[in-house]
Amino acid sequence: MASNQELACVYAALILQDDEVAITGEKIATLLKAANVEFEPYWPGLFAKALEGVDVKNLITSVSSGAGSGPAPAAAAAAPAAGGAAPAAETKKKEEPKEESDDDMGFGLFD
């Protein structure tokens, strides 16, 4: 779990990025001092080195929520358009699952 010092450095870096200011150890330390955050002196430099050459704004906007695969359905939708109506009919046949009865599985509630 991240410590309060780490989180404070992350927030300071995000503030600097939002203001479109270069992220340096000195600027992170200045923000932390202005916010009266107690921190070890190595944290600002560590975060500045980690974010050196990284486009933080692009990094934030490209983070996925992990909810699903966005590009895969778009690619699958493009394939039937190029192939015609025949592949679309085949996918409908594959999507129909075979229904199974719970009776023959032996999972009765009151058995």
Swiss-Prot record:
Disordered: region residues: 65-111
Comp. bias regions, Low complexity: 65-89
Superkingdom as given in the UniProt entry: Eukaryota
The organism of origin for this protein: Caenorhabditis elegans
Task performed by this protein: Plays an important role in the elongation step of protein synthesis.
Taxon lineage: Eukaryota, Metazoa, Ecdysozoa, Nematoda, Chromadorea
Keyword set, alphabetical order: Ribonucleoprotein, Ribosomal protein
CDD domains: Ribosomal_P1 (cd05831)
Keyword field contains Ribosomal protein: yes
Any one of the GO BP annotations: cytoplasmic translation
Coiled-coil features, chain-numbered ranges: none
Gene: rplp-1
Assigned protein family: Belongs to the eukaryotic ribosomal protein P1/P2 family.
Example of a GO MF term: structural constituent of ribosome
Disulfide bonds: none
Quaternary state and interactors: P1 and P2 exist as dimers at the large ribosomal subunit.
UniProt protein name: Large ribosomal subunit protein P1
Any one cellular-component term (Gene Ontology): cytosolic large ribosomal subunit
